[in-house]
C-alpha cells in the first residue's frame, strides 16, 4: 500500500511539474508567455534577469482584456503572485528598455511559475497539523488527484461547448445555403418571366 501510494505520487509529480523557462531577451524588445488558467486560481512566480549596466527590464502580467494583474519596473530578481477571477489566457510579458545612445545586448531571463495546488506549502501544512511525512505526501497526492479531475472536467466541458458551437455553426451554414439557393431560384424564375414578357412585348416570341 505504501509503495503504491509513493509510486502514484511520483508519477503525478512527473506529469505535474513546475513551469520553468529561460530565454534571451534582445534589447528594446518584449517577450510574452501565455497560459490558460482556471477561475479563482492562485498563480505564483519567481523571476531573475541578468544584470547589464544601463539596461532595464520591466514585467507585466495581464489577461486577454488588458487588465493588469501584476507589474514591476526595473526588475532584477523577485517574486509575484495574482489570483485569476475567470478562466482565461493570461500572459506575462518582459520588456527590455535600452537608452538610444547605448548599444544594447541581450539579457537572460529565467522564470518559474506555479499555479493552483502547486502553490501550496505542504511542509507548512504538515507542521501546522502535526502530520507525519507520509501523511503529508498522501495529502499532496489527494490534492493533485482532485486538481487533475477538475482539469479533465473543465476540458470536457470546453469540448462540449466547442461541439455545440460547431453544431450551431453547421446549422446556420446549412440554413444560409438553403436560403441562398431559394433566393437564386427565385431570381432565376423572375428573370425568365421578365425576359418572356419583354420578348413578347417586342414580338420576338409568341
Curated annotation (Swiss-Prot):
Residue ranges of the TM segments: 173-193
Family according to the record: Belongs to the EMP24/GP25L family.
Native organism taxonomy: Eukaryota, Metazoa, Ecdysozoa, Arthropoda, Hexapoda
Record-linked InterPro entries: Emp24-like, GOLD_dom
Keyword Translocase included in the entry's annotation: no
Gene Ontology molecular function terms on file: cargo receptor activity
A single cellular component GO annotation: cytoplasm
Domain GOLD: 30-140
Organism per entry: Drosophila mojavensis (Fruit fly)
Record's subcellular location: Membrane
PANTHER family: TRANSMEMBRANE EMP24 DOMAIN-CONTAINING PROTEIN
Signal peptide (residue range): 1-20
Membrane-related topology note: Single-pass type I membrane protein
Record GO biological process: dorsal/ventral pattern formation; endoplasmic reticulum to Golgi vesicle-mediated transport
A matching Pfam family: EMP24_GP25L
Superkingdom: Eukaryota
Lumenal compartment spans: 21-172
Protein name as annotated: Transmembrane emp24 domain-containing protein bai
Cytoplasmic-side positions: 194-206
Primary role: Eca and bai are essential, though not redundant, for dorsoventral patterning of the embryo. Specifically required during early embryogenesis for the activity of maternal tkv, while the zygotic tkv is not affected.
Keyword set includes Signal: yes
Gene: bai
Alphabetical UniProt keywords: Developmental protein, Membrane, Signal, Transmembrane, Transmembrane helix
Amino acid at each position: 500500500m505504501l509503495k503504491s501510494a509513493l509510486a502514484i505520487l511520483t508519477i503525478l509529480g512527473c506529469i505535474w511539474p513546475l513551469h520553468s523557462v529561460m530565454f534571451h531577451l534582445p534589447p528594446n524588445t518584449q517577450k510574452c508567455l501565455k497560459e490558460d488558467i482556471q477561475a479563482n486560481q492562485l498563480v505564483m512566480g519567481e523571476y531573475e534577469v541578468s544584470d547589464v549596466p544601463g539596461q532595464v527590464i520591466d514585467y507585466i502580467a495581464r489577461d486577454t482584456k488588458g487588465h493588469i494583474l501584476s507589474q514591476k519596473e526595473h526588475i532584477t530578481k523577485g517574486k509575484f503572485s495574482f489570483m485569476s477571477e475567470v478562466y482565461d489566457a493570461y500572459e506575462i510579458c518582459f520588456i527590455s528598455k535600452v537608452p538610444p545612445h547605448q548599444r544594447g545586448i541581450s539579457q537572460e531571463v529565467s522564470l518559474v511559475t506555479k499555479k493552483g495546488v502547486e502553490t501550496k506549502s505542504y511542509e507548512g501544512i504538515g507542521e501546522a497539523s502535526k502530520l507525519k511525512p507520509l501523511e503529508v505526501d498522501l495529502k499532496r497526492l489527494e490534492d493533485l488527484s482532485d486538481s487533475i479531475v477538475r482539469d479533465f472536467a473543465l476540458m470536457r466541458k470546453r469540448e462540449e461547448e466547442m461541439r455545440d458551437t460547431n453544431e450551431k455553426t453547421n446549422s446556420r451554414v446549412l440554413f444560409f445555403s438553403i436560403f441562398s439557393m431559394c433566393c437564386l431560384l427565385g431570381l432565376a424564375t423572375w428573370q425568365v418571366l421578365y425576359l418572356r414578357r419583354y420578348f413578347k412585348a417586342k414580338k420576338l416570341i409568341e
